[in-house]
Amino acid sequence: YFTAYRIDHILGFFRIWEIPSHSVHGLLGQFVPALPMSVDEIQSYGLPFQKDFMTKPFINEEMLNKMFGDKAAFVKETFVQHVHDDIYEMRPEYDTQRKVEAYFSDKKDEESIHIREGVYALISNVLFVPDRKHPSMYHPRIAVQNDFIFGRLDWKEKDAFNRLYNHYYY
């Protein structure tokens, strides 16, 4: 018999991944303690900071149709509202994952679960998360490179974001 301890993720002993109480998934979390980034610091990587585009869920017609198919009309009527052109935003009554979770609490069928998970993904479709103590400072959202909002960036912006992301997380 051996007396041994295996320590995985040593950073976990010093920094904790904090998930906001309004979130179900961890994508909108941030390390605590952490050094959030200022707008100037973000821009120093060559990424022009656009607060609304980068910190509010990016939702457009194409995305809704891709994610929800024939249920896109239901999602538009229930969870999002039209802003302009083909852009939507979350309705205030469903603007957090916990609010969406409450809506689906008694709906356990496969279709409802698919829609619920899709709406969760809409809410987390941001490039940056405001710091919980300093809202004018930001954390790059974890694992955003496979989301729709990242796809909206041009190649220079993607490169700048990835350099910033790698510096921040690694």
For each predicted feature, which ranges?
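Catalytic cores of glycan-processing enzymes that make or break glycosidic bonds
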Residues: 1-170
